[in-house]
Amino acid sequence: MGSSLNDRSVVITRSLSQNESFRRLLEARGAHVVEVPLIAIAEPEDEGRERDEVLQRFDEFDWIVVTSPNGADCVAPFLVASNAAGDAIRFPSLAAVGEATARSLGVTVAMTANPARADVLAEQFPQGTGSVLVVQGNLADDELGETLTAKGWTVTRVVAYRTVQLRPTREMMLPAMAADVLMLASGSAATAWFDSFGTTTPPFVVAMGPSTAKVALALGLEVTDVAPEQTLESMIQTAERVIATL
């Protein structure tokens, strides 16, 4: 049986560097993909100096917690190089929000939140008195760090990357407005959509996870359904379910 997305037009709003895998998955279902990159991933304001300084001494921490594949891409080179050289005094335990983040780290991960949400990781993280490095983007809130602190840990938070907003061209906007489905993979993408399009959306809007849906709803966007897991496959399956009910 074919996908209900076959011959449907689907808008994806992730950064260009992240859109390719999403586009391939949708095209495999027969969807017509409309790419409207509304965000981009950039270096932090200090060009990553603080991040790199902290990661160069990562073996001082008992745990490293990474909340996204973007953060994992910043951490992985330090971990892999040290692991290969065998020069780390000790290797911290690693915790990741979601399987995609865990895979991006490139080394063994002790704890993976599933579904891929920071609040799930915070809940399952143990009580302790050691040190934890939390690696996040500039738009992440402090809830994860605060929860770990309440559990007894000494938390250091470092901004690994910065999410910046892009403005779509008119040539991008027209096919997006005529599409069947809008995929919002983050709260920042929802905000960027609102800033460019207002509350006007395609007929169906799928949000990745409750945090993205919360931002979209607060902006006045009508969210048709919420993917239960913060993965591309979960978003696609949710969109298929929505379309199949027509």
Give the positions of each predicted feature.
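Conserved beta-alpha
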Residues: 1-246
